[in-house]
Structure formats: structure tokens, C-alpha cells
């Protein structure tokens, strides 16, 4: 199925489910949880402390572990094949169960694309209150199934837990050539940074939970969160990039800092080049900021220098993203071609937002 047909299939499925819910109980999923999406994740500083007592594992075939907080593990099977192993799950960011399934699966699959691979097999991770209409859960699972189908992988079951707070996601196994693995620790001086989705999903989702976001913006953020990074990553087959990650729970600056620290470089960010979702700036100015943004700030603030950046813009840069875009480090001479290829393959956005320079006093400088 080509890209146009996949997009049409997605629209038809979404419209069909909006008119035929297949469950009786009225439910607002976002009202059943304390925090939505990646904003519900434990903060990076808290996690780092928890992992201090866990020794790093070394193996000649473990190409990527967790030493650089990378997006997934990569294990070499032979000279031609390596497996990408990842999982992700979170609480609802929308009230529609089917859309929640689509969004969560999109987010879970993203790590495989960030590592330069293709997903093969996925399994469901489900937490759901058994007292609720089973049709609601069925629609969540249907959304996940449809998005996995779009990715080209297959969904083969999973595991569930009875839980008052609904949560959904996937464990995913992907494949990549050992010589084509991408990591978040290989950015080179002279590279530029390309971002493939606008920022603001955490702030917008917080506004949605509060009922203060317009429908047009709701539709836009759902479109962004259900768009697979598969399409941007197709360009990696044509143009070799040095480093990549996806922008998710640790926010744009959190993931940028991890790339800079892992690569032992400094990354300069040009704020004027970064796209924001509609209403994001207005909500940030009004203080509609998820708690995760403050946790992200606390974790990386000593490694980031802001130069004349307004407070509300800073908040957006720390905002935890749900199913965010790819952040790619590519040689400057190849950057325009990469952007053009990404857009041609169907990426929602792709633009140059920064550059890699020799290591300075901070890992990230924002201007």
C-alpha cells in the first residue's frame, strides 16, 4: 500500500469510528487520569537516581544499551541483522478510545525509526479498569492494531492489568543492518539539526484536559500525534545521517541535551526556526504547562544556556512531547536534500533548527 492509500485508509478508519463507537458507556478518558501522555512519565532526574544502583551491561553484540539514554536497545544477530528492542506506554491524551490507540501506537513505534530501523512485530501493553465497558478497550486496541498495520509490522497479542487509570502502549521489535544503526550519541561538529514535527503537544493536551482548546487545534494535534515517523525516516535510505532521536517525554531540550552530551559536542538552537502547534504560545503565556515540563527543566537546566529567550518559549522547549518528531543530526551539505526527501515521503514537517559546534561551557545554547 503506498503512502497516499495509507493516509486515505487512516482517514476512513478515523471517520468510521467517530460515527460508530461500538460501546454504550459515555467516557472521557482524560478525566480518568492525573496526567496525560508522556507528561505522565517519571521525570528524568528521578529515573537517573533510580538507575544508579543498576550496573551497565556489556556484550560484544549489544550495539546500543542504555549508557546514553538512547531510544531503544540494539542487539546484533549476525553481520547482516540486528534487532531493535523497545517499549512505550502511557495514559490517554484524548477522550476518543480509538484515537488514543492510534496515538499511543504511533509513539511506541517511533523509537524504531529513530534508530534507523523498521518495525517487525509488536505486542500490546494494557492497563484498564475491568469495571468499564469492554467496548471502550476494544476501540483502544483497534486503534493500536490499525497503526501497527500502517507501519508494516504485525501485532501478536500482549498482556493486560486491571487498573483504575487506563494506559496503553506497545513493545516493539524492529530490524536494522548493524552498519546502519543510528544513535543519539554520534552528532558531528559541522552537522545541522533537522526537526520533523512542531512542538507543543504536552501543553495542548493539558489545555484539552482543561477544556480550553479550540476544536481546530484539537484536530491539528491529533493529526500530529497519529503521524508515524516512518515517513520522515524513509529519507534515511537515501541520505546518510550521523545521529537521531525522537522528541518525546523529556522535551525538545532534554533530548537535544542527551544528543549533545552523548556526542561530546555543543548544539546551538535557533528558536525562530522551531515550529509550534497553534495555540501553544498563548497557552504557555497563560501558565498552562504540564508538570513534566518543570521536571525536564530541573534535569537539564545546568547544561542549557538561554540567550534572550522569553519564559513562555522556554516552557515550550521543555514541554514533554507525545508522539513527537525526529531530531536528526546531518552534515550541512546534505541537510537541504534530507529535508526535501522527508517532505516528499510524507513527513508533516522538516526544517533546520540548529547546528553542532565544538563543545563549549554548556551542552545546549538557545538563541
Curated annotation (Swiss-Prot):
Keyword Ribosomal protein among record annotations: no
Cofactor: Mg(2+)
Catalytic residue list: 38
Catalytic activity: hydrogenselenide + ATP + H2O = selenophosphate + AMP + phosphate + 2 H(+)
A GO CC annotation given for this chain: cytoplasm
Annotated site location: Important for catalytic activity: 41
UniProt binding sites for Mg(2+): 71, 111, 246
Identification of the protein by name: Selenide, water dikinase 1
Organism in which the protein naturally occurs: Peptoclostridium acidaminophilum (Eubacterium acidaminophilum)
Amino acid at each position: 500500500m503506498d503512502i497516499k492509500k495509507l493516509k486515505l485508509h487512516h482517514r476512513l478508519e478515523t471517520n468510521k469510528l467517530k460515527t460508530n463507537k461500538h460501546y454504550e458507556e459515555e467516557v472521557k478518558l482524560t478525566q480518568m487520569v492525573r496526567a496525560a501522555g508522556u507528561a505522565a512519565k517519571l521525570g528524568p532526574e528521578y529515573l537517573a537516581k533510580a538507575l544508579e544502583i543498576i550496573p551497565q551491561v556489556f556484550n560484544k553484540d549489544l550495539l546500543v544499551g542504555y549508557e546514553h539514554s538512547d531510544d531503544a536497545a540494539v542487539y546484533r544477530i549476525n553481520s547482516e541483522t540486528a534487532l531493535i528492542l523497545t517499549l512505550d506506554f502511557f495514559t490517554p491524551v484524548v477522550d476518543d478510545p480509538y484515537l488514543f490507540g492510534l496515538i499511543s501506537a504511533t509513539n511506541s513505534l517511533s523509537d524504531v525509526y529513530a534508530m534507523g530501523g523498521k518495525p517487525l512485530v509488536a505486542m500490546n501493553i494494557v492497563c484498564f479498569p475491568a469495571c468499564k465497558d469492554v467496548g471502550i478497550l476494544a476501540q483502544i486496541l483497534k486503534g493500536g492494531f490499525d497503526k501497527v498495520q500502517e507501519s508494516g509490522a504485525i501485532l501478536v497479542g500482549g498482556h493486560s492489568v486491571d487498573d483504575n487509570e487506563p494506559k496503553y502502549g506497545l513493545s516493539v521489535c524492529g530490524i536494522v543492518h548493524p552498519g546502519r544503526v543510528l544513535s543519539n550519541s554520534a552528532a558531528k561538529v559541522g552537522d545541522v539539526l533537522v526537526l520533523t514535527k512542531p512542538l507543543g503537544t504536552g501543553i495542548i493536551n493539558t489545555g484539552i484536559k482543561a477544556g480550553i482548546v479550540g476544536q481546530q487545534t484539537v484536530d491539528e494535534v491529533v493529526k500530529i500525534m497519529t503521524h508515524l515517523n516512518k515517513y520522515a525516516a524513509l529519507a534515511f535510505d537515501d541520505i546518510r545521517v550521523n545521529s537521531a532521536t525522537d522528541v518525546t517525554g523529556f522535551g525538545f531540550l532534554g533530548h537535544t541535551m542527551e544528543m549533545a552530551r552523548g556526542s561530546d559536542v555543543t548544539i546551538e538552537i535557533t528558536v525562530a526556526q522551531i515550529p509550534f502547534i497553534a495555540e501553544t504560545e498563548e497557552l504557555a503565556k497563560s501558565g498552562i504547562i504540564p508538570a513534566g515540563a518543570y521536571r525536564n527543566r530541573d534535569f537539564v537546566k545546568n547544561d542549557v544556556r538561554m540567550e534572550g529567550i522569553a519564559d513562555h518559549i522556554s516552557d515550550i522547549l521543555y514541554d514533554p512531547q507525545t508522539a513527537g518528531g525526529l531530531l536528526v543530526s546531518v552534515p550541512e551539505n546534505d541537510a537541504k536534500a534530507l529535508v526535501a526527501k522527508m517532505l516528499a515521503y510524507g513527513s508533516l514537517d522538516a526544517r533546520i533548527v540548529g547546528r553542532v559546534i565544538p563543545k563549549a561551557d554548556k551542552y545546549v545554547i538557545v538563541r
